């Protein structure tokens, strides 16, 4: 299966009552881990780059080339979309130009009418090149590349207006946040999600901040209409924990590890890479997208 737009497989998820994962990558190893997990689970997947991660990796063209060539060299057979996560207007246009197959234009920080107008412009440009479009109403809590939100509930009328711009899937605040959830978090506003999906029947909703939400709430959100769940923090924590454990073991057994040449960065990064793959596979199972390729 070639790299594709996300439109068809996100729509299929919405229609059939499961969700696909949008997994953020940060480097070569993360990309390989996500692809291996998707292939092992035979699940369609979006590999996402935030603006910050793309800058770190060398730019959008580098990211697009890396993912495209890894899909080919690794013999990946499942559908893979290359997706921009929380992109500004100029970034969205650049990603369309360099070959991303899906983009999120995040104008949630703009006045509603300006957000709608710019989203409509992006949709026209993207769809002309077969690129799927995600947009956001309200703001998702937490911080994502300088955009800070408090976890508000997306206004229903704004959501309906955003869908009318022609987007393919909609990110809407339902009490979710980016990053670790605080102990006093009240949970997803599932009653609001139910009202939202009733207002835009059959339309795919995106759940951002998927890391740390209890599985039962995620599954209920999927039942109510969520068709894409974004994951980043969970993978970061898995990578960090595995790498720290390896480093602690190295320090305790330095002579032995040196003898095995475990200072080789390929070996040093391997435990974290394996942990990311495991985290992605586990999320795919929860989302119900295994064997849906």
Swiss-Prot record:
It comes from Streptococcus pyogenes serotype M3 (strain ATCC BAA-595 / MGAS315). Zn(2+) 1 binds at residues 86, 178, 208. CDD domains: TBP_aldolase_IIB. It is an enzyme of class 4 (lyase). D-glyceraldehyde 3-phosphate binds at residue 50. Binds 2 Zn(2+) ions per subunit. One is catalytic and the other provides a structural contribution. The gene is fba. The lineage of its organism: Bacteria, Bacillati, Bacillota, Bacilli, Lactobacillales. InterPro entries: Aldolase_TIM (IPR013785), Class_II_FBP_aldolase (IPR050246), FBA_II (IPR000771), Fruc_bis_ald_class-2 (IPR011289). Pfam families: F_bP_aldolase (PF01116). It comes from the Bacteria. Signal peptide: none annotated. One of its GO terms (molecular function) is fructose-bisphosphate aldolase activity. Dihydroxyacetone phosphate binds at residues 179, 209-211, 230-233. This is Fructose-bisphosphate aldolase. The active site is at 85 (proton donor). One of its GO terms (biological process) is glycolytic process. Catalyzes the aldol condensation of dihydroxyacetone phosphate (DHAP or glycerone-phosphate) with glyceraldehyde 3-phosphate (G3P) to form fructose 1,6-bisphosphate (FBP) in gluconeogenesis and the reverse reaction in glycolysis. It catalyses: beta-D-fructose 1,6-bisphosphate = D-glyceraldehyde 3-phosphate + dihydroxyacetone phosphate. The keyword Zinc applies. Belongs to the class II fructose-bisphosphate aldolase family. Its cofactor is Zn(2+).
């Amino acid at each position: 299966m070639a790299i594709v737009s996300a439109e068809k497989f996100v729509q299929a998820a919405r229609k059939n009552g499961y969700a696909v994962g949008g997994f953020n990558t940060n480097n070569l190893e993360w990309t390989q881990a996500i692809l291996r997990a998707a292939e092992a689970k035979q699940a369609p997947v979006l590999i996402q780059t935030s603006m910050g991660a793309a800058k770190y990796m060398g730019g959008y063209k580098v990211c697009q080339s890396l993912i495209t060539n890894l899909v080919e060299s690794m013999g990946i057979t499942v559908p893979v979309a290359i997706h921009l996560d929380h992109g500004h207007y100029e970034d969205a246009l650049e990603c369309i130009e360099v070959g991303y197959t899906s983009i999120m234009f995040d104008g949630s920080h703009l006045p509603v009418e300006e957000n709608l107008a710019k989203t409509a412009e992006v949709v026209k440009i993207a769809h002309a090149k077969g690129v799927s479009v995600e947009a956001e109403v309200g703001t998702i809590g937490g911080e994502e590349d300088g955009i800070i939100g408090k976890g508000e509930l997306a206004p229903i009328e704004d959501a309906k207006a955003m869908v009318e711009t022609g987007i393919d899937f909609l990110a809407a605040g339902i009490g979710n946040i980016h990053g670790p959830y605080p102990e006093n978090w009240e949970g997803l506003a599932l009653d609001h999600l139910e009202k939202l999906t009733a207002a835009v029947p059959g339309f795919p909703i995106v759940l951002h901040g998927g890391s740390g939400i209890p599985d039962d709430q995620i599954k209920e959100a999927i039942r109510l209409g969520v068709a894409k769940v974004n994951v980043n923090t969970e993978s970061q924590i898995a990578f960090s924990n595995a790498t720290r454990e390896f480093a602690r073991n190295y320090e305790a057994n330095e002579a032995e590890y040196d003898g095995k040449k475990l200072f080789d960065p390929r070996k040093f990064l391997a435990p974290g890479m394996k942990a990311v793959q495991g985290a992605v596979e586990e999320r795919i199972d929860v989302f119900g997208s295994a064997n849906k390729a």
